[in-house]
Amino acid sequence: MPKLRATAVLVVAGLALAGCGGGSDAGGKSGGTISYMTWESVATNAALDKSMAKLQGVGVKREESPNADYAQKLASLIMSKKAPDFFWCSNSQEQNLAAEGLLYDWSSYLKKGDGLQEDKFSPGSLDLWRNPEGKLYGIPTLANTYGFFYNKADFDKAKLKTPAIGWTWDELYADIAALKHANPKATPLVNAWALLESPQGISAYSVANGGAPIVEKPIGSKEVKADATFRAGAEKMAKAIKAGEMTNPDYDGTNAVAQFANGGMPLMFGGQWLHQSITQNKPKFEWGYAPWPAGTAKSVQPIETNGVCSPATLNDPDNTWKVISYMEVTGFNETMKEQPIAPIAYEPGSKGYYEALQAGDAAAKSIAATATYELGVKDKFVTQFLDPWSTPAGDVVGTTFNPALSGKKELNAGIDAMVAGINKLAAK
């Protein structure tokens, strides 16, 4: 499941601490019931319900929440003092809510090593859930990977190797140029997700090729920078967009999955969760999933996890921790084996996900291989801004960087305007 991008988190973060709590109906007490809320699909929730019902010693109740209205419902529950004992949250939500004092600090529970062990989380995943002071206000759960879905027939026709672990940025750009030459009327690389052409995507290119990241540290940054390698990466991408070799940052990728599954494009950028949608469309060609390209200096792969958070006024942290710990291993192993949506940041909980993929076809196995590779790579880049200025920074990117990358404004001027605009927000 992709991370939640709803802006209603701002409504939640603006509430006073007094408005947050488990509530008498939702709060778990010793021997009572622990409540939680997800944004997952009906099928995934049903699979999770079956597994969570097996937990002994404490009751578990999932609160209903329509996927599309999740953030709004969460805000309403906090306002009415009926927030569940734990709830699905994105990394950016967690950082913003924690900054307002609205979340429970799980640091002491993780330190005990009872239920979950710190060294069993995938590299770097826990660090993004700690605030600048090192407190842990959320536990990472479902991990997203991002990469390139490819149509093998199109690559074979153009006499190109299919993308695979270890391919490079130079190969990516050479491939889409060759694919464009083979079929001038088509756009070879289509974005079903905006990350590739975002500042973070360009930052990944920069770091992989020996440059600096756009933010020095993912949490607690007070400025962004765009060095010469970042600008060189942006220039390469802008040229590819102008040549019609890839879609622009504002492209609406709503129909991209269906088009890819029907053989309408050689390459589609997106997350591993699109696997199920592609499969449901029953493609009649060989396809697979490859990770981000390597640069001249290193391979840098994305790190992004969703997680669970609890209200600061949590009534029963002992039993809540017990439920979360059970879910991270048994709950997710059983659920993801039935509904293979994502690997789990807590590595012992990913067994079911990988078993489901390895039992599938070659495409499913390629997704398993890419997910394993991306999660295990040491060098990572963060897929979004996480600091409190992150939401308005998105507006700055949309009016400065995106038009410049699309060729509507001078590129370096657009980058400079983005840097200046975000740094002004970060300085407040």
Feature locations, PLM:
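Conserved N-terminal structural module of periplasmic/extracytoplasmic solute-binding proteins
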Residues: 2-100, 112-118, 162, 283, ...
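Short helix-initiation/N-cap motifs at beta->coil->alpha
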Residues: 64-73, 92, 167-173, 248-261
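Hinge/lid segment of periplasmic solute-binding proteins
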Residues: 92-145, 288, 365, 372
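Short, solvent-exposed loop/beta-turn-alpha elements that line the ligand-binding surface or hinge
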Residues: 107-121, 165, 187-193, 211-232, ...
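C-terminal lobe and pocket-closing loops
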Residues: 111, 274-284, 296-303, 309-395
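Extracytoplasmic/periplasmic solute-binding protein
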Residues: 132-141, 146, 170-222, 229, ...
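Extracytoplasmic/periplasmic substrate-binding proteins
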Residues: 201-208, 235-319
